[in-house]
């Protein structure tokens, strides 16, 4: 396995912020390279050849159910469950959907800061409970459709699922944006993921 952090870009402007934050953390850890690829510019064989140590699936517009919006991300989730994967916003919804969850439309929230209550699991180590996080989404993971293999790790007061993790695999999702300045503990959460 390569010491590579692979970020799959779902054509979102926040991807650059994720890349920058992850790069700063990795420099402090004196470890790993980071590479960004667009979700439709590579195939699964290319990703296999990279043999990444960890994968981040970025936010993006659209719906994770549609291949034209989510590209190779579903294939990557299925292929690399043996190593840490973090999905952010669209990536989070895509992970939830891949494992059998229901993703539906909710009231759009764009730039809204919410309190997030978490379960203290490894992704939230050292993070206050609750903490404040920035949300940009019109889709959400439905509470009535949580798959058996998925645990809800965090939620907002309005009931929106804000974080998930797989029961067996090191696969995680965040509905909120850890890379946003409006998520003061987002860097801590991303660092927890990168240190797993």
Swiss-Prot record:
EC number, as in UniProt: 4.1.3.27
Enzyme class, spelled out: lyase
Active-site residue list: 89 (nucleophile), 177 (for gatase activity), 179 (for gatase activity)
Example of a GO MF term: anthranilate synthase activity
Lyase found in the keyword field: yes
Sequence ranges assigned to domain Glutamine amidotransferase type-1 in this UniProt record: 4-196
InterPro entries: Anth_synth/Amidotransfase, Class_I_gatase-like, GATASE, TrpG/PapA_dom
Annotated pathway: Amino-acid biosynthesis; L-tryptophan biosynthesis; L-tryptophan from chorismate: step 1/5
Keywords: Amino-acid biosynthesis, Aromatic amino acid biosynthesis, Glutamine amidotransferase, Lyase, Tryptophan biosynthesis
Binding-site residues, L-glutamine: 60-62, 93, 138-139
Gene Ontology biological process terms, A to Z: L-tryptophan biosynthetic process
Record text on subunit structure and interactions: Heterotetramer consisting of two non-identical subunits: a beta subunit (TrpG) and a large alpha subunit (TrpE).
NCBIfam families reported in the protein's UniProt record: trpG_papA (TIGR00566)
Protein name: Anthranilate synthase component 2
Organism name: Methanothermobacter marburgensis (strain ATCC BAA-927 / DSM 2133 / JCM 14651 / NBRC 100331 / OCM 82 / Marburg)
